[in-house]
Curated annotation (Swiss-Prot):
Keywords of the record: Cytoplasm, RNA-binding
HAMAP family named among the record's database cross-references: SmpB
Gene that encodes it: smpB
Source organism of this protein record: Leptospira interrogans serogroup Icterohaemorrhagiae serovar Lai (strain 56601)
This protein's name: SsrA-binding protein
Keyword Zinc attributed: no
Ranges in a coiled coil: none
Amino acid sequence: MVKKKEESGHSPLVNKKAKFNFELISFIEAGIVLSGSEVKSLRDKKGNLTDAFAKIKNGEVFLENFSIAPYKNGGYANHPEIRPRKLLLHKKEIEKLERQVKEKGLVLVATKVYFKNNLRVKVEIAVGKPKKLHDKRDDLQKKDAQQEIARALKSSNRYQ
C-alpha cells in the first residue's frame, strides 16, 4: 500500500478580517518566494496577514503588506519584516486575475498561508469585492441572530 504523506502539523495563518471586509468570490492557491529565515519564522507562526493584499505588476503578482517577523536566530542574514513578495502562478491564472481586477473592480486579498506537505509555503488568494459599511452591519446582525437562536435551542434542550 502507498502511504499518504502526513499533513503538516502547522496550523495555517488566517486573515480573519478578509471575510468581514470583503465579499470573497473565488480562491486560488499560489506559491510564494521566500528566504530561509522567512520560512523559519513562518514555522514559528510569526506572520501577520491582516493587511495583506496582492498586486499585479508587469505580468507578475506580488504580495504586499505581509508581515513576517525577523527570525530570532537569523543574525546578519535576517530579512526585512515587510517587503513585496513574489507569488508563483501560471501565466493563464495571472491573466484571468488581471481581467477580473480591471473589469469588475475587484481586489486580490491574501486569506491564508500554510505549509503543503510540510515542505512548501502556499498562499491562498481570494478575489473579493469590498463591502460597504451597511453590508458589514447586516452581516453582524445576521450573525447575532444565529447566535441567539443557537443559545435558545441549547437552553431549551438542557431542561428536557
